Amino acid sequence: MREQHRTYLVTGVAGFIGFHLSNLLLSKGYSVVGVDSLTDYYDVTLKRSRLEILHSFARFTFFKEDIANDDFPKTLSSVNFDVVIHLAAQAGVRYSIERPREYLDSNIVGTFNLLELSVSRGVEHLLCASTSSVYGSNNNMPFGESQKCDTPMSFYAATKKANEVMAHSYSHIHGLPTTMF
């Protein structure tokens, strides 16, 4: 795929990082397919304002969709993309104690759906956001990529660690180029 014609699928496109990354990609001439469920965990009005800005680019397509839905991959059947940047997640440590099912659905099932979609579409690369919460009770500072991350202290951290392990296995089994960050 020629670099200038690359299309990025960005999940969590209306969030802070998703919006700014998509805005940068679009301003550099790339195409972006954005997905966001527009949950009310963060201000929905702000998310809609961000989407208005992204919609000013002709190369931006938006799908209001929950990546944890079984039909999510079918929603994207009309669009092509080369790279997946997976930023969507249910965030928040405290909230994960109160509502663990939402984290299971959004973070684990949603990531599984993205992994399956990436393999079935033969994407060039999958990039997935993790969190510093995966370091858990690790007291070694600063955190390093080679440190153990097997002591999550919240369900949120556990779901993000599970995402890392799932992505690693898909990379190994299916040859899916994957980067966790």
Task: State each model region's role.
Residues M1-F181:
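N-terminal Rossmann-like NAD(P)+-binding domain of SDR-like oxidoreductases, especially those catalyzing
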